[in-house]
C-alpha cells in the first residue's frame, strides 16, 4: 500500500514526489507516456538535447526556487534572445530599442515612444477590449501588424479582435537596447537537459510508465491512501459537462548534417501565410560542438479530445466550465488536483514548482 500515487511525472508531479520522499512517504508515480518529464522532457541526439514538446527556458526571480533546482542539477547561463522574421526581415525580440530601430530607424527612446503614442491615439484613453487593441496600445500599429497579428492569429486560430487583452500582457516592451526576453534575475537550462532534473527528483521513487490511470482508476486508487492527479480535470470526470478547450501543436523535427542552421535557439515566423509559428534549433539552448544540428518547426493546431493539450483557452465560456469541474473536484476527498492540466492554467516552470511545493505543505498540514 502506498501513501500516495501521483498521476503524471511532469514538473508538478515530480516535485510532489521529491518532497513526499523526503518526508519518508511511500510514493508511486504513474505516467501515461513511455517517458518521464511531461512536456519538459528532453531527449539526447548525439550530444544535442532535444526539447520534444517545444522550447522550455527556466526563469525566475525567486531565489528559493532557483536554489531548489540548482541543488538537484547544474544549470547553464542560457539567455533567451529570440528573433522574428517578417517579410524576410529580421527583428529582435522582445520589443526594445533594437526592434524600434529595425522598424522605424529611430535611435533614441523618445522618438520610439512618440511614434507609438501617435499610432495608438485612435483608441484614446479607453481600456483595451481585445488583444488587438491591447497590442497597439503597447507597441503601435506597425509592430502589431508585422510581429504580433499574424503570429498570434496562427497560434490561437482566431482573430486578434476575438482574443482577450490579457494574453498580450505577458509580452515585455522596453525602451533600452536589451534583447533578453525575460527580466528575471535567474535564467538558464539544465546542463544535459530537463530529463536529468526530473530523474533527480524521482530518485528513490517507484515509477511506472505506459499506464493510463483513468482506464483503471478505481483499482489503482485502491493501492494508495491518497492520489495526486495532474492530468486534465475534465477527462478525470469523463467530460461530464463537456471538454475544456485547448490549442494543440504539431512538431516537425529535422536533422541536418551541418553544424548550424539558423544561429539562434528560437526564431518566430510572423507572416500569416507561413504555416509554422517558430523554428527551434536545439543545440543553442545548451551549446555543444557537433557536426550536425537538429531543428523543430512548430505548427499550431485546433485541439480535439484525444489530441495533446498545450495552451488552455481561458475565455469566459471555458472558465465557467472549469468552475463546474473544480466544484466536482472539491468533493473528491481522496484526490488532490494540481498542475497545468488539472488546474486548467498556463504555468511557467518556476510557478508550477512553487505550486507543487505549496501543495505538499498544505497536504502535510491536513494529513
Curated annotation (Swiss-Prot):
Keyword annotations of the record: FAD, Flavoprotein, Isomerase, Lipopolysaccharide biosynthesis
UniProt-listed PANTHER family: UDP-GALACTOPYRANOSE MUTASE
Family: Belongs to the UDP-galactopyranose/dTDP-fucopyranose mutase family.
Entry superkingdom: Bacteria
Residues where UDP-alpha-D-galactose binds: 12, 80, 152, 156, 181, 268, 278, 311, 346
SUPFAM superfamilies: FAD-linked reductases, C-terminal domain, Nucleotide-binding domain
Organism lineage string: Bacteria, Pseudomonadati, Pseudomonadota, Gammaproteobacteria, Enterobacterales
Impact noted for substituting residue 181 to F: Increase in the mutase activity
An annotated GO BP: lipopolysaccharide biosynthetic process
GO cellular component terms given for this protein: cytosol
One MF annotation (Gene Ontology) recorded for this entry: flavin adenine dinucleotide binding
Effect of residue 156 to Y: 2-fold decrease in the mutase activity
Assigned EC number: 5.4.99.9
Enzyme type, top EC level: isomerase
Cofactor(s) needed by this chain: FAD
Residues holding FAD: 12, 31-32, 39, 56-57, 212-213, 340, 347-352
Function of the protein: Catalyzes the interconversion through a 2-keto intermediate of uridine diphosphogalactopyranose (UDP-GalP) into uridine diphosphogalactofuranose (UDP-GalF).
Protein's recorded name: UDP-galactopyranose mutase
Reactions catalysed according to its record: UDP-alpha-D-galactose = UDP-alpha-D-galactofuranose
Subunit organization: Homodimer.
Pathway, per record: Bacterial outer membrane biogenesis; lipopolysaccharide biosynthesis
Cofactor: binding comment: Binds 1 FAD per subunit.
Amino acid at each position: 500500500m502506498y501513501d500516495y500515487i501521483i498521476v503524471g511525472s511532469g514538473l508538478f508531479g515530480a516535485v510532489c514526489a521529491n518532497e513526499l520522499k523526503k518526508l519518508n512517504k511511500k510514493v508511486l508515480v504513474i505516467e501515461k507516456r513511455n517517458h518521464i518529464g511531461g512536456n519538459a522532457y528532453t531527449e539526447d541526439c548525439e550530444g544535442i538535447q532535444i526539447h520534444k514538446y517545444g522550447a522550455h527556458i527556466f526563469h525566475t526571480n525567486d531565489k528559493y526556487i532557483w536554489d531548489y533546482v540548482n541543488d538537484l542539477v547544474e544549470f547553464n547561463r542560457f539567455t533567451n534572445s529570440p528573433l522574428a522574421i517578417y517579410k524576410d526581415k529580421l527583428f529582435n525580440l522582445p520589443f526594445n530599442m533594437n526592434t524600434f530601430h529595425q522598424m522605424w530607424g529611430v535611435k533614441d527612446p523618445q522618438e520610439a515612444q512618440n511614434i507609438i503614442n501617435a499610432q495608438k491615439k485612435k483608441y484614446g484613453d479607453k481600456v483595451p477590449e481585445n488583444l488587438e487593441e491591447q497590442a497597439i496600445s503597447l507597441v503601435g500599429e506597425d509592430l502589431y501588424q508585422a510581429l504580433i497579428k499574424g503570429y498570434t492569429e496562427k497560434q490561437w486560430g482566431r482573430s486578434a479582435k476575438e482574443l482577450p487583452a490579457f494574453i498580450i500582457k505577458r509580452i515585455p516592451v522596453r525602451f533600452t537596447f536589451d534583447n533578453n526576453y525575460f527580466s528575471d534575475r535567474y535564467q538558464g537550462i539544465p546542463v544535459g537537459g530537463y530529463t536529468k532534473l526530473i530523474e533527480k527528483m524521482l530518485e528513490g521513487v517507484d515509477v511506472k510508465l505506459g499506464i493510463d490511470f483513468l482506464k483503471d482508476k478505481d483499482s489503482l486508487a485502491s493501492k494508495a491512501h491518497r492520489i495526486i492527479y495532474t492530468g486534465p480535470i475534465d477527462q478525470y470526470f469523463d467530460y461530464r459537462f463537456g471538454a475544456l478547450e485547448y490549442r494543440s501543436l504539431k512538431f516537425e523535427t529535422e536533422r541536418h548534417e551541418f553544424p548550424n542552421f539558423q544561429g539562434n535557439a528560437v526564431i518566430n515566423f510572423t507572416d500569416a501565410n507561413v504555416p509554422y509559428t517558430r523554428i527551434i534549433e536545439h543545440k543553442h539552448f545548451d551549446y555543444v560542438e557537433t557536426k550536425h544540428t537538429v531543428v523543430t518547426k512548430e505548427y499550431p493546431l485546433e485541439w480535439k479530445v484525444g489530441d495533446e493539450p498545450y495552451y488552455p483557452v481561458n475565455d469566459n465560456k471555458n472558465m465557467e466550465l472549469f468552475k463546474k469541474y473544480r466544484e466536482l473536484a472539491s468533493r473528491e476527498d481522496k484526490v488532490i488536483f494540481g498542475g497545468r492540466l488539472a488546474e486548467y492554467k498556463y504555468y511557467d516552470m518556476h510557478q508550477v514548482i512553487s505550486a507543487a511545493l505549496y501543495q505538499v505543505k498544505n497536504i502535510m498540514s491536513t494529513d
